[in-house]
Swiss-Prot record:
Zn(2+) binds at H429, H493. It comes from Acinetobacter baumannii (strain ATCC 17978 / DSM 105126 / CIP 53.77 / LMG 1025 / NCDC KC755 / 5377). PANTHER family: PHOSPHOMETHYLPYRIMIDINE SYNTHASE, CHLOROPLASTIC, THIAMINE BIOSYNTHESIS PROTEIN THIC. Binds 1 [4Fe-4S] cluster per subunit. The cluster is coordinated with 3 cysteines and an exchangeable S-adenosyl-L-methionine. GO terms for molecular function: 4 iron, 4 sulfur cluster binding; carbon-carbon lyase activity; zinc ion binding. GO terms for cellular component: cytosol. Its EC number is 4.1.99.17. This is Phosphomethylpyrimidine synthase.
Amino acid sequence: MNQLTNLSSAEISAQHEQDAKDLTRILPASKKVYIEGSRPDIQVPMREISLTDTPTGLGGEHNPPIMVYDTSGVYTDPNVQIDLNKGLPSVRQKWIEERNDTDVLSGLTSKFGQERLKDIRTADIRFAHIQNPRRAKAGKNVTQMHYAKQGIITPEMEYIAIRENQRQREAVDMRQHPGQNFGAKNLKEITPEFVRQEVAEGRAIIPANINHPELEPMIIGRNFLVKINANIGNSALGSSIDEEVAKMTWATRWGADTIMDLSTGKNIHETREWIIRNSPVPIGTVPIYQALEKVDGVAENLTWEIFKDTLIEQAEQGVDYFTIHAGVLLRYVPLTANRLTGIVSRGGSIMAQWCLAHHEENFLYTHFDEICEIMKAYDVSFSLGDGLRPGCIQDANDEAQFSELKTLGELTHRAWEHDVQVMIEGPGHVPMHMIKENMDLQLEVCKEAPFYTLGPLTTDIAPGYDHITSAIGAAMIGWYGTAMLCYVTPKEHLGLPNKKDVKDGIITYKIAAHAADLAKGHPGAQVRDNALSKARFEFRWDDQFNLSLDPDTARSMHDETLPKEAHKSAHFCSMCGPKFCSMKITQNVRDYANNLTNSDSEVEEGLKAMKEVYQEQGQKLYHKV
């Protein structure tokens, strides 16, 4: 494993060498900058995109750089030496220690974790620098929600406020349409106190396990920028640890705000350790997947004890949020009988099968308060799973789906009583005209806890293009108030996504999230659009490429027809050519208008002269030629 993940090792194949370069390559005209907070160790990363000046012929003005949100971590910082074998540098360790409410344990307390650590068969693939985990001191609660309710502004909250603002005060063109926010708050400036209030009220979460100090704090809530999640993970059919780590770093490079490791294949424990130690963003999991592996895939053999040990195992590794399918109740399972596609959630189907086999209530529901006790000891956030989500548009918004959603609302209140952070997972497959009903009901029954949706996919006829069918729904539900969108790749329903699929899914969902921010009228959301539009009008081609979500693709598409360097300053593109470019024509019209110096009296004299000509020609509109 060490040879596979060492970026400089001669053992790495040529493709892996290229992958390593791709992960650390700085995007064109960009540089990593850090904004300092109220203390020297609050250093908030952003990406600064430099722009060229407007040509003299078009006014000759300076265009200041544009600041954008950056999820890539230190991988794009040339001053940091990347060594995957050692993991990322800690961002939050000092903050956690200063609070003096955690203990460093003498070792892992999870039975399974202890077994894996002693298993000589995993020695070669095990992360070499495993630290003893932290846990809350007896009687202490270490969640960001608990601190927020106590009126405490943590360094994480200040970090997030700086990050969300993206230095908007320095932006030149803040023109923006007002948008329709459906009750969300559009503050011109996010303050640390506002972050605290939103977390205290449960309207936002800061997923940040005390055992993931490498994490760069971020927030999920409808009054903040819309976030996106990327799913990765191995399966029984393939993928290695280094491939999954590469997928994670690749996804964060292009804009994934969180990552879910949905591994169901070999070495789940070790794969997750490598991912967490090298991830600058929160990591989520579905613990029931690994619990099922521990009973050889037989759902009926699952027990609360096995699941509890899995929660502790993953919490001690540093998982930041758990998807828990506690809303799949025994009485709801029959409601899916007449569905076209039944239960499509893996976690939902596992728990439904267990309930039917034992004819007992879902043990995730009956042990929910015990789960909360574990969550608050490590500050793991809930992502309450939608195990009965619709798997096709025909099943959208049915009784099974909405019954579960109402139960998730009940569980949200129970989690909040423990000061545990909660977000709610949503569908699924929903046609456009039925999407808003989902958002409205979620806001009502879950009291504005953040909504986290998979799409939704708006049609079922496009396998291979479901990143598009879902992005349509994602943009809409993001506009209505969803806080985080789970990406869908072109491989959805077809296979395990590769590196290209991951990037395609990320870019597609960055578009959907940004479109939602624009539609909501989120302050500053239009700054980048304005800058790119200005560059386009002024034929600053390089600036257009560099301001785009995917500069590499934009440049390569332009170069397919206009490859020469001289074409980067041409006042046309291959779509219209030099004579029919609307923007060039508009510039000519502007130049003509600016050169008109006629006074009002001159205009009147001209009109009088033309009137006389008209009368001399017999006052006829048309004349024979």
